[in-house]
Amino acid sequence: MQLKIMPKKKRLSAGRVPLILFLCQMISALEVPLDPKLLEDLVQPPTITQQSPKDYIIDPRENIVIQCEAKGKPPPSFSWTRNGTHFDIDKDPLVTMKPGTGTLIINIMSEGKAETYEGVYQCTARNERGAAVSNNIVVRPSRSPLWTKEKLEPITLQSGQSLVLPCRPPIGLPPPIIFWMDNSFQRLPQSERVSQGLNGDLYFSNVLPEDTREDYICYARFNHTQTIQQKQPISVKVISVDELNDTIAANLSDTEFYGAKSSRERPPTFLTPEGNASNKEELRGNVLSLECIAEGLPTPIIYWAKEDGMLPKNRTVYKNFEKTLQIIHVSEADSGNYQCIAKNALGAIHHTISVRVKAAPYWITAPQNLVLSPGEDGTLICRANGNPKPRISWLTNGVPIEIAPDDPSRKIDGDTIIFSNVQERSSAVYQCNASNEYGYLLANAFVNVLAEPPRILTPANTLYQVIANRPALLDCAFFGSPLPTIEWFKGAKGSALHEDIYVLHENGTLEIPVAQKDSTGTYTCVARNKLGMAKNEVHLEIKDPTWIVKQPEYAVVQRGSMVSFECKVKHDHTLSLTVLWLKDNRELPSDERFTVDKDHLVVADVSDDDSGTYTCVANTTLDSVSASAVLSVVAPTPTPAPVYDVPNPPFDLELTDQLDKSVQLSWTPGDDNNSPITKFIIEYEDAMHKPGLWHHQTEVSGTQTTAQLKLSPYVNYSFRVMAVNSIGKSLPSEASEQYLTKASEPDKNPTAVEGLGSEPDNLVITWKPLNGFESNGPGLQYKVSWRQKDGDDEWTSVVVANVSKYIVSGTPTFVPYLIKVQALNDMGFAPEPAVVMGHSGEDLPMVAPGNVRVNVVNSTLAEVHWDPVPLKSIRGHLQGYRIYYWKTQSSSKRNRRHIEKKILTFQGSKTHGMLPGLEPFSHYTLNVRVVNGKGEGPASPDRVFNTPEGVPSAPSSLKIVNPTLDSLTLEWDPPSHPNGILTEYTLKYQPINSTHELGPLVDLKIPANKTRWTLKNLNFSTRYKFYFYAQTSAGSGSQITEEAVTTVDEAGILPPDVGAGKVQAVNPRISNLTAAAAETYANISWEYEGPEHVNFYVEYGVAGSKEEWRKEIVNGSRSFFGLKGLMPGTAYKVRVGAVGDSGFVSSEDVFETGPAMASRQVDIATQGWFIGLMCAVALLILILLIVCFIRRNKGGKYPVKEKEDAHADPEIQPMKEDDGTFGEYSDAEDHKPLKKGSRTPSDRTVKKEDSDDSLVDYGEGVNGQFNEDGSFIGQYSGKKEKEPAEGNESSEAPSPVNAMNSFV
């Protein structure tokens, strides 16, 4: 029994407080966290804890062990039935029962046969409280029969024909695993053309000449007995008619070859299954495997579809080059018609497979153990489902309930047994059996009626010590039936504790949330029920906290000096104190420079490595405090160092005492250059294996001039020597003479030996090969050996060339192997190698994580929990779990755009994880998958969850429009991320005086459905600052700010001597805002009407963006300004403002940088200079016409008329009154899109393709600039480039600017 107490807590009130102790509905009666002495007296019905599987296939070569274990009080006795009758084990000398359990051991290794003990076994565990029964265990010995002998004729067929090589393995138990190999035990390659069917046959859609071989061998592996049987080899010869001589070809017909299929190109036909339709039945939870293999030329490709729905994306697996469709964890919803389509260039054919999914019984609610007190009520519920629906039957103590002794306290209602007013005699074990034609479920659940007086399990006189101002928890673990009530008392004769300062937990623990000195004392716990009372005393002591009186301080010291840190601690005198010093949160270095003296840490001869954080940690048995300080080390004032140099290289190298594995090298040292030589470094070159590369051999003292060197066999050595002093290393000496050592067997084996599978059915053994230096002789090879770790198989070995891997085929999936790799050469073997463990290839996990739960922490964070998958289903190394999650749509349904899936991976065996960065008020979906080295397993069922509302973002924009004398109108766009349902807007504003001081703040609430609001009764000519933000139920969002000025009072600007009504005031106005742009700059000009003494400023930014305006102040009262550093080809927004005593005015425009200069159409038709210029143009044209007329009258040949017709001057074209060329601009006109050939495009730029002439044409390309006064630089210089023909096809009137340029 496992007692589960919910971790609730409740305040004590006056009077008794009932406390649960105990056994409420227990999931299992196997894990009871109670005192062992209590368990010795607690009566409990038996419960089966371990049993053999229902379908128990045994190895006939080993003893039979049929497991049955159970627990109960008193310990249960065991009995067995075989094939429905009592099995008397005493009459069979080969059968024994394991002591203390019901497990049967049948000794067939000494004598007897496994077949004798085939049958259906059932175990019964019984004590005075009832009887529990096991499942029906069907015992069958495994079988691995030999292949029947058969004579296989060679097969000869033409290239392009189809072929089926039958396997037909012997029927074994369990069925064998089939694979095809050659006589070298190498897997035969498979492809879309050649593949193995589910029945083991090898199918060729069409054969090729390279398919010719004499060793097509089918193997059957019986995993249970670890045996492999093989079929006789099949010989296949593929020929073509062209290869036959004319005589044979003339007398040979297609029917004399294997099969009847033509060798010519042909549409697909199915080799398996046959016909146009077939049926398939599968059980729920299994893997549904559907197969279609077709022949044809060219090779057909297989496609799959479900007629009445989509294939389940996360559970569908394609295998065998898509010839096999598998659906994992098949359910009733997967029933239906599946179609496979075979297609090649000559046609297509399809086959329909009708799938019906049935279901063995599975639990909806399995019955749970029930523990009751006398007189209580309870229920046992047994609910299962299946297809067909299972039948529910009840047994009590292993006997059908219909014939069991009657119990007046129980009532059977279908799948439920109702108990009322139970007594101790009502204790029993009930069995629920749910069965249909595909299987059964059997569950034991006991009803245990107990009557026990209260017992307190906490040891008496337990002493609790607690630091003051911290919580104190006093335990009172208890047990009893019926449920006892718990009371606490303080002092020998104190009354029950019921003040608010105490908290009583349901497990009996008394909590004092903030313990004080006066909490010290003796506390008594009392447990009562109708059968008795129990009490226990515990003691509480309150201790003073530990604290650091003097903390260490930050220090900066020079290298080589000393530093001291002080740490004074005060603590409760009754507790022992230990003070520990740490450096960078680690123990102090084991260096005598660090000394601890009482309250001080002293560091002598400080070095740079001593820099860091030093922490003083004061510990008592009850608490711990710490304080830290940083030490910084600086360099002392440097002093000049003497000049030294590295040694000269050694010379006169000589080899003596030349043996097989050693040689003596001697040399003469070079000059040490005023610094003694401390050592010599000897290097060698292997001229045979790695010429030109020098390797470290050894080092000797600087006083030596000879060295005895150890050598390896089969190496052509050269040596060189370098001298080292305090300055550095010398240049190498000249190389010595070469010395070749004799060959011998290897003295070491390869390293880094590993065994990992690249496919589910192989084992790739890799190692780091020996280099030439380590080979010790010619003919280096490796002996690779392997066997399964779990089993008694002999080692399998193979000798391979000097490579770094070997692939073992036909292995079971993810099985541990023992591996060893031994080196050998022509001289012999290396020592016996070490054995390492590897694993055969991994396969994708089969099972999805179950019981996925989502706990939404807040609007942007969720916690996901799941149950781990069974280790056997992982089929590989567990890498972790992966969560796919995505937002399907906003909860407010305002955002339905597709969101990409996000992935979070949690390493290892974690069963929970956090999803950060979620969007508030959104609808999310997730699933969980287990990951191994091969990849991901199937996804768990999708889980959906919603995030709560969050605070909104700032409103997207805020504009102040239509300023008047006493009002301003605000317009805004809602937040781009509302993160919930907007409840209202808040507007706060305050005036700003001339000294930039802020006035009183006004707070205003605005309904959420508004996007415009007018503020009235404001002060005239006053600047206001506005703060604006949105709100949801979660709170207020970020604010957006803006400033605006009400217009000036018109009466206030009249001259003092003019009465009202005599002189009309003129409102300040900015007009004709012009933006002339080049590639990276623009010239902004405008006209201003209004009072003098104003300050202008220019604001600009990228059009359409939400970035803030960039502001530039205009010096003086100029009406132009140059913007620099702009991005080419970019549309900009610009506005010009004027601020003065008369208030605030502004004007806006949009321009675009680029090769065409941007210019807004200027209203110059009413300008005097323009009218004069037009008159001069007209006069010159008139003079030109008169001259031409005179010359023509004189008989001249100048073709004026033809030239005029060919190049009509746009300046003499009539101007239409309705084209607005000389009219005033209206708001509507400014925003109308212009047609091709119009004066100005809609974005207010002059583009080359829209006008015959442009300012750029008369400037220096795109580099035309402007003077400070706004005039053009280089406007009239250079030649005009040739324009496209369509540029002169516009029939509309030219712009005044173009007219001026044409004239010039």
UniProtKB/Swiss-Prot annotation:
Gene Ontology molecular function terms on file: ankyrin binding; cell-cell adhesion mediator activity; protein binding involved in heterotypic cell-cell adhesion
Principal location: membrane
What is one process in the GO biological process aspect for this record?
Answer: clustering of voltage-gated sodium channels
Q: What is the effect of changing residue 1093 to P?
A: In a breast cancer sample; somatic mutation
Can you tell me where the transmembrane regions are?
A: 1168-1190
Q: Which cysteines are joined by disulfide bonds?
A: 68-123, 167-218, 292-340, 382-432, 476-525, 567-616
Residue(s) carrying Phosphoserine: 1226, 1251, 1254, 1271, 1290-1291, 1295
Positions with biased composition (Polar residues): 1288-1304
Any ranges marked Cytoplasmic in the topology annotation, and which? 1191-1304
Keywords, in A-Z order: Cell adhesion, Cell membrane, Cell projection, Disease variant, Disulfide bond, Glycoprotein, Immunoglobulin domain, Intellectual disability, Membrane, Phosphoprotein, Repeat, Secreted, Signal, Transmembrane, Transmembrane helix
Task: Give the glycosylated residues.
Answer: 83, 223, 245, 251, 276, 314, 433, 507, 619, 716, 802, 858, 993, 1009, 1019, 1072, 1083, 1115
Note the effect listed for residue 55 to G: In NEDNMS; uncertain significance
Q: What is this protein called?
A: Neuronal cell adhesion molecule
- From which organism does this entry originate? Homo sapiens (Human)
The coding gene here is: NRCAM
